[in-house]
Amino acid sequence: MPKMKTNSGSKKRFTLTGTGKIKRKHAFHSHILTKKSKKRKRNLCYSTTVDTTNVSQVKELLAMK
């Protein structure tokens, strides 16, 4: 059976940390920023980890299963 291909869109969006968690960026921080508050924009600029409910799906896209 051939190897599973990595989803090319996913490999641009997700990175694996040293502890095995999957890191992602927040959405809604690219345009139409004038109506968003300073606090909201600041919180959106930081990266976060993928939720535990979605980890298996993201790992499948990254061909890690």
From Swiss-Prot:
Signal sequence coordinates: none
Entry keyword Transcription: no
GO BP term, pick one: translation
Keyword Ribosomal protein: yes
GO cellular component, one term: cytosolic large ribosomal subunit
Keywords: Ribonucleoprotein, Ribosomal protein
Region Disordered: start-end pairs: 1-20
SUPFAM superfamilies: L35p-like
One MF annotation (Gene Ontology) recorded for this entry: structural constituent of ribosome
Family: Belongs to the bacterial ribosomal protein bL35 family.
Protein known as: Large ribosomal subunit protein bL35
Species lineage: Bacteria, Pseudomonadati, Bacteroidota, Bacteroidia, Bacteroidales
Annotated gene: rpmI
